[in-house]
């Protein structure tokens, strides 16, 4: 399903004249009432939109609406034992289906047609959704559902389930289920409630919407004319005040208690702000997207006495809604459920049938087993790095991933592959001596050492689980008495030119492009780079591209210096590019005295900057004609007139100060680049198009794995997303002042900034899937331990926030599409839904290998949820989308 391609009338609107869409135009969505869908999916998606709209517009009775005083009473409670029974009304719409069936893509249409808040269960899910939405139109950043309901870093270590709860009825009522969930999540719920009420400054209600409503009445405007603009006039408003439709992608990764937590926080926030939707007695509508058979909710508990982290599986939101009779009947799930069928990631018929068998719990036949047999190879064949180069290995545990990465690095060191070079970078952990001593006192472990504590908490200190996958060396500790810190250092091994992913939302400085002429021409033609810069003003993006184009124009002349080119075509190329430059810069004599656009741009340069006048290179009075006077003459003496790129002699880019000047400069430089591209494309064809093309904002030298540059100033600040594909190009010690300022601002009080400035970590250099080169900021994560309601700021970790795509856990691969996949299952603890996730990552079964056939091995299978899904498929009220 795409965001363009077909049009259908909604809600009985009168048909109008057809919209003639020009290439590159954004489809018009007047009043957000028309959906632009792919014709093959249009009829299946329209009922989904209609039902969600109906649910979002249904009004409640006044007695059902929770009042603000109820939340004030909750904030005054010391324990959840005093929580009264109270219904928090909500509605649910489920969108489920097998892997790659288009569930997440459906959200594109929901986002365009309905006013909704789109979120993800995890950062990866949120950023994957952002990539889909921004691919069609510019999109606001997509946050996790935790961020939207107010979850904070100190809640990560909250102790869940401290207070036991027994349901008071059988079958349990909705009120009883919601009170159980609030009791289980009490520590977080209480903190969220107190923070929200404290933010009101002691006032009964927040004033943002009341002030706009008063202004509407004063100006005689229609109700809602101004209040609906509140998110624009008050940028800090919570997203839940904007809409009552909340979309959660990959909802199967959330524990069941988070369903009630989201509903509770929506009501609390809207009651506090007294929003128009609260005044209209509307309820939250949760659109839960995911697959209950693919995903599972996990909860971890750390035992301080044993220094051991235990992980257990809990009931997830999707399974909770589908299997719990009370919720199923309350939500009228038969009328609020859409199931997407058919794997669009891998469209092979036999493989698609296998995916349906695993998704819907259908009987596994001998024919299915024989089909999977063809993918089985010996385990040592998969774990041997010499085999299957370029394939992604999937393992069941982080320990297996780390072991394979160590084996891969050892192999690369021995073979010394020219393209793939192994190098190490330091990772630092700063442990507070004061907080560590307090931790030992509270846990009654006076003999505990920092080394032992760091080893046991390695997976908790960083802000991403993939840190356990890394091939790290022996840890070394240093004591800094002045700062009262212990600094633990690990050397982590990386592979140059390998595919990696960033694991957190990190700032990056884009400073150049490295790819081919064809790739850069494609960027300029469709403005894809500008569209992805939703974090900044587009003028900065155009100014940055102008710098790259100006620096890269000389590459066309460099290409013509390559040996083996036809001399006649080379001469013709020089002549035609010279004519193009003369035309663009208006170098030909003109009778009119009116200044041209190019001359105005050249004269608008910075003070003191003048283009070099190469016409002065002729013979001077009193000197011999054949002997150059200075070094500059020596340089140009070796070039004939055609080989000299006169563009640089007559044009100085300067720094445009207005929006119009920025666009004018970009248009001129873009015209120069595309004109030269067409000339060489016609003369040399594909040999030119695929030739290497690199351009940077400053002089750049790659010496082995290290990038050397004078200064990356002039680059573009942006954000590295987890959904982008990156290649590791090396590292640099060049300082980026914006990164250093952020470090001092955030971590000056912990003395970490001081130590990092004395011995700075390098920045990694990455190239994204489009070819743009970036320096990525250091990933700083803070670890706060929670012991008996006491919070200890134990450690701060500084690393690079990257993980390899050469190998990962099956859980990490959730939601990804991988070209070539080799899977190593663990025979003793095999879950069929995990095997389903791993196998469904591939885009072609031709590039799928595994160490065993999970269908023939002893495995666990969740048949309960499958029975409910099969029952839904037979229900005529459930929407089926093919």
From Swiss-Prot:
Mutation: residue 14 to R; reported impact is: In strain: Nonneuroinvasive mutant HF10
Q: Does the keyword Nucleotide-binding apply?
A: yes
Q: Which GO terms describe its molecular function?
A: ATP binding; helicase activity; hydrolase activity
Instruction: Return the InterPro entries for the record.
Output: DNA_helicase_dom, HSV_HELI, P-loop_NTPase
Q: Give EC number(s), comma-separated.
A: 3.6.4.-
- Enzyme class, first EC level, given as a word: hydrolase
Give me the residues that bind ATP, please: 97-104
What family does the Swiss-Prot or TrEMBL record give for this protein? Answer: Belongs to the herpesviridae helicase family.
Protein name, entry field: DNA replication helicase
């Amino acid at each position: 399903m795409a965001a363009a391609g077909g049009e259908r009338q909604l809600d009985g609107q009168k048909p109008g004249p057809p919209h003639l869409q020009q290439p590159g135009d954004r489809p018009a969505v007047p009043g957000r009432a028309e959906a632009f869908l792919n014709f093959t999916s249009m009829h299946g998606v329209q009922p989904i939109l209609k039902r969600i709209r109906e649910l979002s517009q249904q009004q409640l009775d006044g007695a059902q609406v929770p009042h603000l005083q109820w939340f004030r009473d909750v904030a005054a409670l010391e324990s959840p034992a005093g929580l009264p029974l109270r219904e928090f009304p909500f509605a649910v719409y489920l969108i489920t289906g097998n892997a790659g069936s288009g569930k997440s893509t459906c959200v594109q249409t929901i986002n365009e047609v309905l006013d909704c808040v789109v979120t993800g269960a995890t950062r990866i899910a949120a950023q994957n959704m952002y990539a889909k939405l921004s691919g069609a139109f510019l999109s606001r950043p997509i946050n996790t559902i935790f961020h939207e309901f107010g979850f904070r870093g100190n809640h990560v270590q909250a102790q869940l389930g401290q207070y036991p709860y027994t349901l008071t009825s059988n079958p349990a009522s909705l009120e009883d289920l919601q009170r159980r969930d609030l009791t289980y999540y009490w520590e977080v719920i209480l903190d969220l409630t107190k923070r929200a009420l404290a933010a009101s400054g002691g006032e009964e209600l927040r004033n943002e919407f009341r002030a706009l409503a008063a202004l509407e009445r004063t100006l005689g405007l229609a109700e809602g004319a101004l209040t609906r603009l509140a998110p624009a006039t008050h940028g800090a408003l919570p997203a839940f005040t904007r809409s009552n439709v909340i979309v959660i992608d990959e909802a199967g990764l959330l524990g069941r208690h988070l369903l009630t937590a989201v509903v509770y926080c929506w009501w609390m926030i809207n009651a506090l702000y007294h929003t128009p939707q609260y005044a209209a007695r509307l309820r939250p509508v949760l659109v839960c997207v995911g697959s209950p058979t693919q995903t599972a909710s996990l909860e971890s508990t750390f035992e301080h006495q044993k220094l051991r982290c235990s992980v257990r599986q809990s009931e997830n939101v999707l399974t909770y809604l589908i299997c719990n009779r009370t919720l199923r009947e309350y939500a009228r799930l038969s009328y609020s459920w859409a199931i997407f069928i058919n794997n669009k990631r891998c469209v092979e018929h036999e493989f698609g049938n296998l995916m349906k068998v695993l998704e819907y719990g259908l009987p596994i036949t001998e024919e299915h087993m024989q089909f999977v047999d063809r993918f089985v190879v010996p385990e040592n064949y998969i774990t041997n790095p010499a085999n299957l180069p370029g394939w992604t290995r999937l393992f069941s545990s982080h320990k297996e991933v780390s072991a394979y990465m160590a084996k891969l690095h050892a192999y690369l060191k021995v073979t010394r592959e020219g393209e793939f070079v192994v190098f190490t970078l330091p990772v630092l952990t700063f442990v507070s001596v004061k907080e560590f001593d307090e931790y030992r006192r509270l846990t009654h472990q006076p003999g505990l050492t920092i080394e032992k504590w760091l080893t046991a908490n390695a997976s908790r200190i960083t802000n991403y689980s993939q840190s356990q996958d890394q091939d790290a060396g022996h840890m070394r500790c240093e004591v800094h008495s002045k700062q009262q810190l212990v600094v633990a250092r690990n050397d982590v091994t990386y592979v140059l030119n390998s595919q990696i992913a960033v694991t957190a939302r990190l700032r990056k400085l884009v400073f150049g492009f490295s790819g081919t002429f064809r790739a850069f021409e494609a960027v300029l033609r469709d403005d894809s780079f500008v569209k992805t810069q939703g974090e900044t003003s587009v003028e900065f993006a155009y100014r940055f591209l102008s710098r790259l184009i100006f620096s890269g124009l000389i590459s066309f002349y460099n290409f013509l210096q390559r040996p083996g080119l036809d001399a006649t075509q080379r001469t013709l190329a020089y002549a035609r590019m010279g004519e193009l430059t003369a035309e663009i810069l208006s170098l030909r004599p003109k009778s009119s005295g009116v200044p041209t656009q190019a001359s105005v741009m050249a004269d608008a340069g910075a003070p003191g900057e003048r283009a070099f006048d190469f016409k002065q290179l002729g013979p001077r009075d009193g000197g011999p004609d054949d002997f150059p006077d200075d070094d500059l003459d020596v340089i140009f003496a070796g070039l004939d007139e055609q080989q000299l790129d006169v563009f640089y002699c007559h044009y100085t880019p300067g720094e445009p100060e207005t929006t119009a000047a920025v666009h004018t400069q970009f248009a001129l430089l873009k015209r120069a680049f595309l004109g030269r591209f067409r000339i060489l494309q016609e003369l040399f064809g594909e040999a030119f198009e695929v030739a290497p093309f690199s351009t940077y904002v400053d002089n750049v030298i790659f010496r082995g794995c290290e990038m050397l540059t004078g200064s990356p100033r002039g680059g573009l600040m942006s954000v590295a997303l987890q959904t982008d594909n990156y290649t590791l190009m090396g590292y640099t010690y060049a300082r980026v002042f914006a990164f250093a300022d952020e470090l001092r601002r955030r971590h000056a009080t912990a003395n970490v900034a001081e130590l990092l400035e004395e011995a700075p970590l390098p920045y990694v250099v990455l190239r994204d899937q489009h070819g743009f080169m970036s320096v990525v900021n250091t990933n700083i994560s803070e670890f706060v331990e929670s012991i008996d309601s006491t919070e200890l700021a134990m450690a701060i970790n500084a690393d690079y926030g990257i993980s390899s795509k050469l190998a990962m856990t099956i859980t990490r691969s959730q939601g990804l599409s991988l070209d070539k996949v080799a899977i190593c299952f663990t025979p003793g603890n095999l879950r069929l839904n995990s095997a389903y996730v791993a196998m469904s990552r591939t885009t072609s079964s031709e590039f799928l290998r595994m160490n065993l056939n999970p269908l023939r091995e002893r495995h666990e299978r969740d048949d309960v949820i499958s029975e409910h899904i099969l029952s839904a498929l037979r229900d005529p009220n459930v929407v089926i989308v093919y």
